[in-house]
Design a protein with these regions (language model features):
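Active-site neighborhoods and metal-handling regions in enzymes and metal-associated proteins
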Residues: 1-385
């Protein structure tokens, strides 16, 4: 089935309880919002929809207590019937009955961890402090990051399905994109095709053309695609809430040899780099491979200034399109089997434009298993129209 079964969700909570005990915590409060739902969806199997409300999730797991899920009032009704957790409350009651309920956990010397603190609004943190003034609240988001970074067989199965749809959509777009179309029209085709194939959208579809490709992200406009321009498509379908982040750049007819060569070389380089990834090696090897392959081609200046920050060469992928760990020039953590990453090569200032080739892979004992296969299985000039 295209979901995570309740048994796996419950097992995750039990693993979490053991980690809480190992850290001498009395409980944990996990927060996520509807745009980055992964921290709570990982345990609940529910992803809120943003209808006419903001609908975060808050999961409260205290020692020797059943878990409590707090969710927005409109999502509450479907969550109550579909989520395995029995104690489900409404978010707008946080400052009344939920705060009153939390007071029983207010004990001197108690420690209740907070996860997802970078998403949690100040007013909610203040409510916890007011309800439990004698409790210490250490930040323990790394517990969840460590759990989520290693994927289960079912998680990878869902991610494979999402990747297959991404590859199919980008393949269809190759014959659809034409000079004179707008960025918004390309988004419309991508989103329609993805949904027609059964996918949800993990995040907004990014389509940028020409001068707009200089940005790391861009909301599609009515700008028309012109002759010889690079057209970047970053499409993120999701199956069972598990995302794919495969992106390609198309080159319109009439382009310069310089841009054509840069795009062909980017495909060649990402193939070599992905095939070189090994378990038990440092993540910085991704950057180093890109650098070593770009330098002889005089493309290193189009790469190096842009890879020191967040997501410079990729990132983890799963319930969220972008999740821990981050890949950049300084990411010296170790690759382990069943971690999943978007491996991303961005080149900038190519006659004032930029390109991206991004493919999601699973780390294995032997090396990598590509989940996206489009850029890896086709010729280096495949995206040149």
């Amino acid at each position: 089935m295209l979901i995570i079964e309740d048994k796996e969700l419950k097992d995750r909570v039990e693993i979490l309880r053991k980690e809480i005990k190992n850290r001498n915590l009395n409980g944990i409060i996990i927060y996520s919002d509807e745009y980055r739902s992964g921290y709570c969806t990982y345990f609940t199997g529910y992803k809120p929809i943003n209808v006419i409300e903001e609908s975060p999730q808050t999961l409260i797991v205290m020692e020797n207590e059943d878990p409590i899920l707090v969710i927005g009032r409109l999502n509450y009704y479907s969550a109550r019937e579909t989520v395995w957790i029995k104690n489900i409350l409404q978010h707008h009651k946080f400052d009344t009955e939920i705060s009153t309920m939390l007071k029983k956990f207010n004990k001197k010397g108690s420690k209740i961890g907070i996860a997802g603190e970078h998403l949690m609004p100040f007013y909610l943190r203040d409510l916890f402090t007011k309800a439990m003034p004698d409790v210490n609240f250490p930040i323990v988001t790394e517990i969840l990051d460590d759990m989520r970074k290693i994927k289960s067989p079912q998680e990878i199965f869902l991610m494979e399905k999402a990747a297959e749809i991404n590859d199919k959509v980008l393949t269809e777009l190759k014959s659809i994109i034409k000079i004179g179309m707008t960025e918004q029209q390309v988004v419309a085709h991508a989103d329609f095709l993805g949904r027609q194939m059964g996918a949800d959208l993990g995040s907004a579809t990014v389509v940028m053309s020409g001068k707009n490709t200089k940005f790391p992200a861009w909301r599609a406009t009515d700008k028309k695609i012109n002759k010889g321009e690079l057209v970047m498509v970053d499409f993120n379908p999701a199956i069972g809430y598990y995302c794919n982040d495969g992106g390609l750049t198309f080159l319109m007819p009439g382009a310069s040899k310089y841009k054509s060569d840069a795009l062909k070389n980017s495909h060649k380089i990402i193939k070599k780099t992905i095939n070189s990834i090994r378990s038990q090696t440092k993540a910085t090897n991704v950057h180093d491979s890109f650098y070593d392959l770009l330098k002889p081609l005089s493309l290193e200046p189009n790469f190096s200034p842009y890879v020191t920050g967040t997501r410079g060469t990729g990132h983890g992928v799963g319930l969220d399109v972008v999740e821990f760990p981050d890949l950049n020039k300084f990411s010296n953590f170790i690759f382990y089997p069943n971690m999943t990453f978007a491996i991303k090569l961005d080149l900038h200032d190519l006659e004032g434009e930029g390109l991206r080739v991004e493919q999601v892979v699973q780390i294995t004992e032997e090396g990598v298993k590509p989940l996206n296969k489009l850029a890896l299985n086709n010729s280096d000039d495949w995206a040149i129209l």
